[in-house]
Regions:
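Sec-dependent N-terminal signal peptides of Gram-positive bacterial secreted proteins and lipoproteins
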Residues: 3-20
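Short loop/turn motifs at secondary-structure junctions
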Residues: 4, 61, 162-165, 267, ...
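Boundary/entry segment of secreted carbohydrate-active catalytic domains
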Residues: 22-64, 68-70
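Substrate-binding cleft and catalytic face of glycoside hydrolase catalytic domains
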Residues: 30, 60-81, 87-237, 307, ...
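Short, acidic/polar
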Residues: 46-61, 147-157, 242-258, 295, ...
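Glycoside hydrolase catalytic-domain groove-lining segments
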Residues: 94-95, 102-106, 203-233, 238-322, ...
Length: 399
């Protein structure tokens, strides 16, 4: 009898001890990053709203989320409603996006709006008469009207339904081309093609579609009296040629319109650096210390233009399980760069959003996540448990 009681007592004490360990106070990552001037966030898909473990991580350690696809135009635009609209302007279905923003609001997280204008994967019918891809393209005038209406409706919807939750928008995404994707005479390098496919925004509106998008976004934010920051977002932003073209573009955006007194209106507040760091689908180029200097220089260069900077889609790539310690060391050094650039009074870096949050050790080389994020690149393992790299970053931030 005594032995049975002893066993029962042990069984009762084991879970209690486990709970005690789990309940030990943890410093949220975002509290540590905010002490250095920048938010800490992660990506969230609609399906992850049912992943309780990941949601708990976001609630505990993040103060920002970005919807991976659900706030993009191709997810929001509703063809049947657009065709039936009385004013000929586009209409949207916000149901999935609303659930995600509502979750953020309920749990005290801000949302990066991503993204208003992006040529990739865009619904073709948006550019055609009667919203029918089988009919001719609309005129520049009509396309500008549709663009203004779309941007105005989307920003207004989220601000009025969830006041203050969407704290910034990527207004335009990846408009700066590379290689032969732009007119060499254009210092902004506005892309005319992507992977051999024409940029329909460029073809229907012209190369100034970016400036108009920012004008419409700024006018909407001003009319709402909202505190929403407006970003231009792109990849390869820390390489010199792309960086210089982005600077030329932001200068063009911020000199495009004037206020009532004739002074230039600042339409663009900052640059989103996507932050896919390392080889695309290959270990070659991963954890290259030279990238740390490039990132630091890029942040400072954009800041010198009066722009704030956010790392918006960060994945520190690693494809080799044997190099997880090297990966952790590189990640810590990267966060040291973030802290260092913010040591002055201006603190130009205002946010870091990690998209390569999880390990995918069984990913195949042909998959999208393999190429974009790598297999052993996460702050969390494949089960969503924080890895040593996560705690090493926390320890460094506490120093």
């Amino acid at each position: 009898m005594k032995r049975m009681l002893s066993i029962l007592l042990m069984l009762m004490l084991v879970p209690c001890a486990a709970l005690a360990e789990e309940d030990e106070p943890v410093t949220p990552m975002y509290e540590l990053t905010m002490a250095h001037g920048f938010r800490f966030g992660g990506a969230l898909s609609y399906m992850q709203l049912w992943d309780a473990n990941y949601l708990n991580f976001l609630k505990t350690h993040c103060n920002s989320i970005t919807a991976t696809n659900e706030m993009k135009a191709y997810s929001l635009l509703d063809q049947s409603k657009s065709r039936a609209s009385s004013d000929g302007m586009p209409r949207m279905n916000f149901s999935a996006a609303d659930k995600m923003v509502a979750w953020a609001q309920e749990n005290g997280l801000g949302v990066r709006g991503h993204v208003l204008v992006w040529d990739a994967y865009m619904t073709p019918w948006f550019f055609h008469e009667q919203y029918d891809a089988g009919k001719p393209l609309v005129s520049r005038e009509v396309m500008l009207q549709r663009l203004e209406s779309y941007i105005t409706q989307v920003i207004t919807h989220f601000e009025e339904k969830f006041p203050g939750v969407v704290y910034c928008w990527d207004v335009v995404n990846e408009a700066v081309g590379e290689g032969s994707e732009f007119d060499p005479a254009d210092p902004r390098h506005i892309r005319t093609t992507r992977g051999g496919v024409r940029n329909v925004f460029y073809d229907t509106i012209g190369s100034d579609y970016v400036e108009y998008a920012f004008l419409y976004a700024r006018s909407t934010v001003d009319a709402l009296g909202a505190d929403i920051r407006l970003f231009y977002n792109d990849y390869n932003t820390f390489y010199a040629e792309k960086r210089d073209a982005i600077i030329a573009l932001t200068r063009s955006i911020n000199s495009f319109a004037v206020d009532a007194d004739g002074n230039p209106r600042k339409l663009c507040d900052g640059v989103g650096m996507q932050g896919y760091i390392g080889g695309y689908g290959t270990q070659v180029g991963c954890m290259n210390v030279n990238d740390l200097a490039l990132i630091s220089t890029a942040i400072k260069t954009y800041a010198a233009e009066g722009l704030e900077v956010q790392l918006t889609e960060m994945a520190v790539r690693n494809f080799d399980a044997a190099k997880v310690e090297e990966h952790a060391d590189f990640y810590v050094r990267l966060f040291k760069v973030f802290c260092t650039v913010n040591r002055g009074d201006t603190q130009p870096l205002t946010g870091v959003s990690v998209w390569g949050m999880f390990d995918f050790p069984n990913d195949q080389p042909t998959s999208y996540t393999y190429k974009m994020n790598g297999t052993h690149s996460g702050l969390l393992d494949e089960k969503g448990i924080p890895k040593d790299v996560f705690w090493q970053i926390e320890a460094m931030l506490k120093e």
